[in-house]
Amino acid sequence: AFEMYSHCLDIYPQGAATLYEIAKFYMFLNQPDKGERALKEAVAADPNNYWYNQTLAAYYQNKGEAAKAIYVYEDMVSHFPKRLEPLMSLVDLYNRTKDYQQVINTLNRLEERDGKSEAISMEKFRMYLAMDNDEQAFTEIENLAKEYPYDMRYLTILGDVYMNNGKEEEAYSIFQKVLKEEPGYAPAMLSMATYYEKKGEDSLYQAQLDSILLNDRVESNTKMNIMRQLILRSEQTDKDSIKI
């Protein structure tokens, strides 16, 4: 088959399909340089073929050549506006190279093409935190909490963001709202414990932890983690951990 494809290229060197197939042969024969060259020629011969472009981009990505992979995927975004996969690959690549602003830019492009989603908003929230851009992180999680007002996860995260940025009373109000809606919601209960700890209210902090440990709705793994934290806290303050 290899000889047949080689003969076809002798007759018509610009045959994109033939170049693509022979590129795969070169890769199989562990001749990556020749395979890469044939792949690039296949893309040049038929730039509108999605799979030729995808194979070349994936080759660069697997080889660890992020810049080259990004270049191909960015070109694919322009050539194939209805395909979301190139944008998703770019999110991953920009993440790996720690180019967080480009991650956000790419997520915005995903939103423009596919609409707003929880996953995109949460990823943007994480990126803003990684960039120490607390104001934008606030905005992103606030919008998400407004869009999903009955999802206790986002309200609790919003409360945590408030608390970590000096807005303790706003955080307290949110945690109380969550626990009124869902009394046994462990993340909000833990956040309340953290709130009391930050305020220096040790008795309320301890009482909150006790309520978590005694709550049947809280998973055993969460309780075990709390026990570990209590033991560590006890040891650090020279108390007898056996009392716990």
Regions found by a protein language model. Name each.
Residues L214-Q236:
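Amphipathic alpha-helical repeat scaffolds of TPR domains
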Residues F28-L29, N62-K63, R96-T97, A130-M131, ...:
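Register position in tetratricopeptide repeats
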Residues C8, E41-A42, D75-M76, R109-L110, ...:
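Canonical positions in the second alpha-helix
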Residues P13, P47, P81, G115, ...:
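Short coil turns that delineate tetratricopeptide repeat
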Residues A17, W51, E85, A119, ...:
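Start-of-helix register in tetratricopeptide repeats
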